[in-house]
Swiss-Prot record:
SUPFAM superfamilies: Ribosome recycling factor, RRF. GO terms for molecular function: ribosomal large subunit binding. Keywords: Cytoplasm, Protein biosynthesis. Disulfide bonds: none annotated. Belongs to the RRF family. It holds the Pfam family RRF. GO terms for biological process: translational termination. Signal peptide: none annotated. Responsible for the release of ribosomes from messenger RNA at the termination of protein biosynthesis. May increase the efficiency of translation by recycling ribosomes from one round of translation to another. This is Ribosome-recycling factor.
Amino acid sequence: MIDDTLLDAEEKMEKAVSVAKEDFANIRTGRITPAVFSKIVVDYYGAPTPVQQLASFHIPEPRMVIITPYDKSSLASIEKAVRDSDLGVNPSNDGTIIRIVFPELSEQRRRDLVKVARSKAEEARVSIRNVRRHAKDGIDRIVRDGDAGEDEGRRAEKDLDEATHRYVGQVDELLRLKEADLLSV
């Protein structure tokens, strides 16, 4: 019973770390990746569809992306969705592909993105700590109900604390890498 609580807590902590990875991938750095387009949704024949399902992405230069739609009729809707997104870019359409040149990040914009990354990391840490608190309450309840001994409860809390520190450390490492990536010119 205690082992189930610990396993459940570890799964939820792992999920918090993976959400943090996704959030960090969506924060733009000097190099563009297709992940910056992951939140863009296109109105495709009346259905909201992620742009990554409608086109392929080619990155010939660090700040340029070429989007090639699988269906040429979706070209205008993809262009509109990218233009209306919060990326702050103006795509150009030549009839078969969409070419996007991202502007160079200013020092102020880089610092703003570092703040965004730090807030995403803090959200992940809070989520991990909430999972820990919930699991600790579950362990305490199991011990109080007499389904496990106090020694086993203390051992489980120690394991839970170690897992919490491990996952918070992973988030801190992801943040450190993202900050280094953002601040490198």
